[in-house]
Swiss-Prot record:
Root EC class: transferase
Name of the molecule in the record: tRNA (guanine-N(7)-)-methyltransferase
Function: Catalyzes the formation of N(7)-methylguanine at position 46 (m7G46) in tRNA.
Lineage, opening ranks: Bacteria, Bacillati, Bacillota, Bacilli, Bacillales
NCBIfam families given in the database record: PRK00121.2-2, tRNA (guanosine(46)-N7)-methyltransferase TrmB
């Protein structure tokens, strides 16, 4: 998907540096000083326009949230959404998921959310999928044993691939749903994509996995 260039994005992010952290590697091992507390940190990789993470932050004020988004033209919308929500427990980073270990110390993160990630359906693009083993290793390095991944998608192929990837990596499957919106799971915060696909009658798939302690 081609992202529309927004020439004002840099200035906007600089004006909202309290939300969009411009030098995240400087806070590696010190994110508690950014939030001013020692609450657990949950990250969303591919935070998109920010509806999910801003909603989670409002719903769970005792958890600190950090959204990771590669595209500057998208993260500006997320920054505005967080700003409008007035949630104080969420920050956003305009970085690549490959750099997670440059930004977080081992064990500094407790949970990773992956919501409607690009499925990269072609076999030659497998290594780009956020549930590929390379990325699972990144998540493990910043979470350590006991960390967990919560994963949602509308793409059945990506879901099946991810379950296999989780299993081969040795992760413990603790929850799975092939139709999330008709399940008994409470407190689900929908993303923008999720609302769109659900309105079309598309089932939403969800899995939760954790590292064995």
């Amino acid at each position: 998907m081609r992202m529309r260039h927004k020439p004002w994005a840099d200035d906007f992010l600089a004006e909202n540096a309290d939300i969009a952290i411009s030098n995240p590697a400087d806070y590696k091992g010190k994110w508690n000083t950014v939030f001013g507390n020692d609450n657990p940190i949950h990250i969303e990789v591919g935070t998109g326009k920010g509806q999910f993470i801003s909603g989670m932050a409002k719903q769970n004020p005792d958890i600190n949230y950090i959204g990771i988004e590669l595209f500057k033209s998208v993260i500006v919308t997320a920054v505005q959404k967080v700003k409008d929500s007035e949630a104080q427990n969420v920050k956003l980073l305009n970085i690549d998921a490959d750099t997670l270990t440059d930004v977080f110390e081992p064990g500094e993160v407790k949970r990773v959310y992956l919501n409607f990630s690009d499925p990269w359906p072609k076999k030659r693009h497998e290594k780009r999928r956020l549930t590929y083993s390379h990325f699972l290793k990144k998540y493990e390095e910043v979470m350590g044993k006991g960390g967990s991944i919560h994963f949602k998608t509308d793409n059945r192929g990506l879901f099946e691939y991810s379950l296999k990837s989780f299993s081969e990596y040795g992760l413990l499957l603790t929850y799975v749903s092939l139709d999330l919106h008709n399940s008994n799971l409470e407190g689900n915060i929908m993303t923008e994509y999720e609302e769109k696909f659900s309105a079309l009658g598309q089932p939403i798939y969800r899995a939760e996995v954790e590292w064995r302690t």
